[in-house]
């Protein structure tokens, strides 16, 4: 599906999530295990009795060294199978950003598109109606208005991407496609009798013909009762053997958002996508809320990894 590139999903944790140190280990020039000093880790939010130079506080199950008390890690482990974890690799890249602002130009969507990512239906998707599709800005030098991300943050956004009107509701899907094909043939017959009296006569007629044929083709592939774009009907995502239970999916907006974006991107319907989650400024005055939010982000990250392994 799509351009055949590796699917790319960006998690934009608005507010400035604490990634380096308390979630994923950050070391010196020798890599993750080239540990910082006690004072260095303290600046990253780690107390002296939880330093990663103690092997008990390091987890490398995902091919990337996490702090064993990481909320991200707890969430990812809940959403993934042992086989998926064994096949996962990772890296951490240090980048400077400002706190509590959406002005950090770190969103990579347009760069990923420029590298060749594309989808069968959409180039880019994002869970916010912004130029980048997320909370963070896209670098000005990369912005391409032709492929501005389409907003997808719920299952109905994904399933509604292809709308064939009332035909599917009135007729059986196969009958609806037959009607559209008949319309195409009638229109084609009419076009053969029309002289547009312009130099690009054949080009115009070809575009009209292709438009009708493409509409019928989209209706044939996506206009079925069980919409192939709908994450709710994908048993790998929701259900007894799915990544999310039905109760989790119905009652957690972040899970529904994640499922919608990953359904499109990992199946090649979109080239790349951004999932924005809020509240990562940790300004609640206590640690518990931030830990729960980190764990929920981890659940969503793990869901993307697990779904990628399944499809």
Which residues fall in each region the model found?
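A contiguous, mid-domain pocket- or channel-lining segment that forms the substrate-recognition surface
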Residues: 18-19, 74-221
């Amino acid at each position: 599906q799509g351009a055949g590139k590796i699917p790319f999903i960006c998690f934009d944790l608005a507010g400035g999530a604490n990634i380096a140190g308390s979630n994923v280990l950050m070391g010196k020039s020798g890599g993750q295990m080239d540990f910082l000093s006690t004072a260095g880790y303290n600046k990253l939010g780690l107390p002296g009795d939880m330093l990663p130079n103690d092997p008990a506080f390091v987890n490398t199950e995902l091919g990337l060294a996490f702090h064993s008390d990481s909320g991200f890690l707890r969430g990812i482990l809940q959403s993934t199978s042992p086989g998926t974890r064994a096949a996962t690799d990772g890296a951490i890249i240090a980048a400077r950003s400002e706190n509590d602002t959406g002005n950090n130009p770190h969103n990579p969507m347009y760069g990923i598109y420029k590298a060749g990512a594309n989808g069968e239906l959409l180039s880019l998707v994002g869970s916010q109606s912004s130029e980048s599709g997320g909370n963070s800005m896209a670098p000005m030098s990369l912005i391409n208005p032709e492929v501005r991300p389409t907003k997808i943050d719920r299952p109905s956004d994904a399933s509604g991407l292809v709308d064939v009107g009332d035909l599917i509701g009135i007729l059986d899907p196969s009958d609806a496609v037959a009607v559209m094909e008949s319309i195409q043939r009638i229109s084609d017959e009419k076009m053969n009798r029309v002289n547009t009296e312009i130099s690009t006569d054949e080009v115009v007629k070809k575009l009209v013909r292709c438009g009708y044929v493409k509409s019928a083709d989209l209706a044939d592939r996506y206009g079925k009762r069980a919409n192939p774009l709908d994450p709710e009907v994908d048993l790998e995502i929701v259900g007894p053997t799915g990544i999310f239970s039905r109760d989790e999916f119905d009652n957690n907006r972040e899970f529904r958002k994640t499922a919608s974006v990953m359904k499109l991107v990992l199946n090649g319907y979109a080239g790349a996508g951004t999932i924005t989650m809020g509240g990562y400024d940790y300004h609640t005055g206590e640690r518990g809320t931030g830990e729960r939010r980190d764990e929920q982000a981890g659940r969503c990250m793990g869901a993307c990894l697990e779904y990628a392994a399944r499809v």
